[in-house]
Amino acid sequence: MFSLISAGVAPGVALLSYFYLKDEYEAEPLSFVLRMFLFGVLLVFPIMFIQYVLAAEGIVASPAAEAFLSAALLEEFVKWFVVYFFVYDHDEFDEPYDGIVYSASVSLGFATLENILYLLANGVETAIARALLPVSSHALFSVIMGFYFGKAKFAVKKRRYYLWASFLLPFFLHGVYDWLLLAKERWGYYMGLFMLALWWAALRKVKQAKGYARPQAVPPVKSQA
């Protein structure tokens, strides 16, 4: 049991550590990061219940509906909601890269408990595949989300546009990911290409977010009198 739970926890903790340590200006308070991680953990059960109801009522009768409605829309919106209402206006969100750290915290909390439950049901032999696909995909969706949260927080213009992008892009990518899994026809080939493109895009966003200048307060103008 210990080895199974360890296998379930390790990918999420490793990915969160990676994104956390990439913050080169000022590391975020670990207590706040862990709080957001636990928020993500707590999201699993209500989301699973809603997904069960959607399936039982026949609302998600097709692979596309299951991928984009039951999985992508529900999961990404709830994670977006948590980051927006608990992090976006927080004093600790003081540089663009912080959006990635906190979005990853919520998403990887969710992905970690989901991963543990899956391994308990299907065995530890699925751990590597789970780490490479579901856990890492949640992390990569969160990088896109967090990047645009950072843009929205500190942009002078287009803040509403970036906020919409912080939800719509992860939602779309998550929907495509689940649809490829459910399509089954040559899914391994297309999924490999999709994940490579997703990793490339996410790491590029990490680099871009790190490169943005940290916002500085404008010094007051001294009186000439």
From Swiss-Prot:
Cellular-component GO terms for this entry? plasma membrane
Q: Which Pfam families match?
A: PrsW-protease (PF13367)
Localization terms from the record: Cell membrane
Q: List the disulfide bonds.
A: none
Transmembrane domains' residue ranges? 1-23, 31-53, 100-121, 130-151, 180-202
* GO MF annotation list: peptidase activity
Record topology, Extracellular segments: 54-99, 152-179
Signal peptide (from-to): none
Keyword annotations for this protein?
Cell membrane, Hydrolase, Membrane, Protease, Transmembrane, Transmembrane helix
Its Enzyme Commission number?
Answer: 3.4.-.-
According to its record, how does it sit in the membrane? Multi-pass membrane protein
Topological domains annotated Cytoplasmic: 24-30, 122-129, 203-225
Role according to the record: Involved in the degradation of specific anti-sigma factors. Responsible for Site-1 cleavage of the RsiW anti-sigma factor. This results, after two other proteolytic steps catalyzed by the RasP and ClpXP proteases, in the release of SigW and the transcription activation of the genes under the control of the sigma-W factor.
**Record protein name field:** Protease PrsW
**Species per Swiss-Prot/TrEMBL record:** Geobacillus kaustophilus (strain HTA426)
